Amino acid sequence: MTEEKVERVPPIEERTLPKRDLKEQPYRLLVTGSEGFIGKYLVNFLSLDQVYSEFVIDTLDIKNGQDIGDFTRPDIRHDCVIHLAAFADIRNSLDDPERFWENNVEKARGLFKYCEVNNIRLLYASSAGAKEWWLNPYATTKKVNEIMAPHNSVGMRFFNVYQEEFKSRHDMLFKMLEEKTATYLTRHKRDWIHIDDVCRAIARLIPSTITGIVDIGTGQSTSVIELAEAFHQGDLPIKEDTPGEPDELCADISKLNPTGWYPTYDVLSSVRMHPGYEFNPNYAKGNKSNESTELETPQQEGKEEET
């Protein structure tokens, strides 16, 4: 992991948000799904950031009794909406596709319309699975979101987001391996991206002129088996039959390059730096535990480096 003491986001004068007297009228963001895994970290990240701490951040979440399906045009106008409220579970979507369609598609229509009519910048959660949207109902809802979104919005295709120290969602493989509750492995390869890097990417996208679909990952895939081996759990049984799931997912992060963003965490390094990590001599035989797997920092000419 790298920790460089530099600005997380560009200074305000470099932003594309409308310029105005912020004391009279501060910038205003709306974050839906603010109590979810990504949403909670994002709101905290923005509130601590030296630039975004000056913004007014409104939140909306079902856990606070606020259903996105009941969204109506507010009295105040937002400068940007970050829509993270959605069901995200492949297996449950296979069991109840109608419920996922209602929540992820139908309930989002009012919010999308609000942004379109008022020309408000919209960043919404899509999924890496939307590329092969036909594999499961969850991915289908994310693909439909991409189709129905306003033309000047950003569909953020999140890859496998994780956070160490038992802070990921309970149903995420990374946390299951931390807790030693995983019962099987698969042969899948996934692009694991740290929650801090996700928040930094969103912070960069808010003021940018980028639109369309944007992959938010590291650009490197790691197999489930390799990750399990790093956790000393490579001997778990392999499940071959995994309906609805793609074999490999890996982000193309080139569209984020103009923002100066790059990933700063590597999932295998995160495991080795885990408080409960113990050296695995079998894993070291592949020269994987003696060498740093930190991602190389790309040269961003004319761009600031990130923390």
Predicted regions and their residues:
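NAD(P)-dependent short-chain dehydrogenase/reductase
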Residues: 135-139, 143-199, 203-204, 230-232
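Conserved Rossmann-fold NAD(P)-dependent oxidoreductase catalytic core, especially the SDR/UDP-sugar
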Residues: 109-139, 154
